[in-house]
Design a protein with these regions (language model features):
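His/Asp/Glu-enriched, well-ordered alpha-helical/loop segment
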Residues: 27-57, 106, 125-128, 132-134, ...
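Glycine/Thr-rich phosphate-binding loops of Rossmann-like dinucleotide-binding domains
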Residues: 71, 94, 142-144, 219-220, ...
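Histidine/acidic residue-rich metal-binding segments in metalloenzymes
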Residues: 6, 10-134
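Short, glycine-/Ser/Thr-/acidic-enriched flexible segments
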Residues: 67, 91, 139-141, 216-217, ...
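Short, conserved clusters of charged catalytic residues that mark active-site
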Residues: 3, 69, 117, 184, ...
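Single conserved hydrophobic/aromatic residue that forms the stacking wall/gate
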Residues: 1-12, 258-263
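C-terminal cap of metal-dependent C-N hydrolases
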Residues: 149, 203-256
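Residue-level signal for inorganic ion chemistry
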Residues: 60, 87, 137, 167, ...
Length: 263
């Protein structure tokens, strides 16, 4: 399909363009990642998927929407009335182009982190119902795998452990309501994927629960990171929200930074 060719071709052509531009340099700067994995390529890919699903009358869930323009492809109708739904990742709700300067390849992911206008549009789309799900896109690469330039560094970052507190921090800033966070991270995923007896606190449902507290600020550092990769792009960030306990199927599996058992 021409749309696929345009999307993939755009990435390849831009990749080759920057290889040539920086052939006498140590590597391609990470700041060029969003130019290689461009907004145009994202839109072409999503547009094709939505068009094909619409023509076929098929059910479609689009992952990792990262640009303002892509949001035009989706509806703000109630979830139960949609045949085409959309998801945004926490990284794209937190970071923007300027953050490459400080965090470098730590925030390299696919799709790439885009401009602040894209991030702000995604946040608004969460609130208006255009974005149906918030996901982690958890990819716990080792720091050694994140080394290199815009092409060599692995894409993805560990996001599960601090995903909820990150979103609750945005709620504290007035960006989302707590109810919206619960809807996008619990209710909607269960409904969209048809996961029975989960996603809600209801009698007869599996008790998958998280107990959080709100108090003094604490800081993410290597001592409280539980992921085996041993790092987080959120190191140095502080939060007032804290996960105290996690239950899966009614069993306590996490208690104050202690991983107890598998569910």
């Amino acid at each position: 399909d021409r749309s696929v060719s345009r999307g993939l071709g755009d990435v390849y052509k831009r990749q080759e363009y920057y290889k040539e531009m920086f052939r006498n340099a140590p590597g391609i700067p990470i700041s060029k990642h969003l130019n290689i994995r461009s907004a145009a390529a994202c839109y072409s890919s999503s547009q094709l998927a939505v068009r094909m699903a619409s023509l076929a009358g098929a059910r479609l869930h689009v992952l990792h929407v990262s640009t303002a323009k892509e949001l035009q492809l989706f509806s703000d109708a109630p979830l139960e009335d949609k045949h085409i739904t959309a998801e945004a990742c926490i990284a794209h709700l937190l970071y923007r182009q300027q953050d490459y300067k400080e965090l470098g390849t730590r925030i390299k992911c696919n799709p790439s982190i885009k401009k602040q206008a894209d991030r702000d549009a995604l946040r608004n789309a969460v609130n208006t119902g255009v974005i149906d799900v918030i996901a982690t896109d958890h990819a716990p690469h080792l720091l050694s795998e994140k080394e290199g330039d815009a092409l060599k560094a692995m894409s993805g970052m560990p996001m599960i452990q601090f995903s909820l507190v990150s979103m609750l921090e945005l709620a504290e800033k007035g960006i989302f309501s707590i109810e919206t966070i619960v809807e996008k991270m619990c209710h909607a995923p269960a409904q969209i994927y048809g996961i029975c007896n989960r996603g809600y606190i209801r009698e007869g449902y599996q008790a998958d629960l998280v107990l959080v507290s709100h108090g003094e600020r604490w800081e993410v550092n290597t001592e409280n990171i539980l992921s085996k990769c041993g790092w987080s792009p959120l190191e140095g960030n502080s939060f007032r929200w804290k996960v105290e306990k996690t239950f899966a199927n009614g069993h306590l599996i996490y208690l104050s930074l202690i991983h107890i058992s598998e569910p």
